[in-house]
């Protein structure tokens, strides 16, 4: 399966995980089950290192409570996933990058964003 849009990833995850559902539209994460919350990113390019915006990471870790917290990155025909609770904060490299303010709109303003570089040895395929 080729993952071109977030909806492609959602459809696939619903197929392989029994009790997973879409989260509410304005939620800080994309999907949830009784056991976990999931944030999804679809990338158009491959990177040697994947990142998560610090704001997003902090929000997810606060909201997940006792649930699992997963970050799923889709690129082409592969899904990479990170168990964020399995990554010690000391393993995260902080980087400040110029990025679009949001990814939802074209011609978006470029702003500086703090992002964590996720450790490759914690990546699951």
For each predicted feature, which ranges?
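Hydrophobic anchor at the start of a short beta-strand
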Residues: 18-20, 38, 68-70
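Acidic, low-complexity, intrinsically disordered interaction modules
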Residues: 45, 79, 87-103
């Amino acid at each position: 399966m080729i993952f071109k849009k977030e909806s492609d990833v959602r459809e696939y995850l619903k197929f392989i995980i029994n009790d997973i559902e879409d989260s509410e539209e304005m939620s800080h994460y994309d999907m949830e089950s009784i056991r976990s919350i999931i944030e999804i990113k679809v990338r158009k390019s491959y990177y040697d290192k994947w990142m998560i915006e610090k704001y997003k990471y902090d929000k997810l870790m606060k909201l997940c409570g006792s649930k699992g917290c997963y970050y799923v990155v889709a690129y082409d025909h592969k899904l990479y996933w990170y168990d964020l609770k399995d990554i010690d904060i000391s393993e995260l490299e902080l980087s400040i990058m110029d990025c679009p303010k949001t990814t939802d709109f074209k011609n978006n303003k470029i702003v500086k964003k703090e992002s964590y570089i996720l450790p490759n040895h914690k990546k699951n395929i």
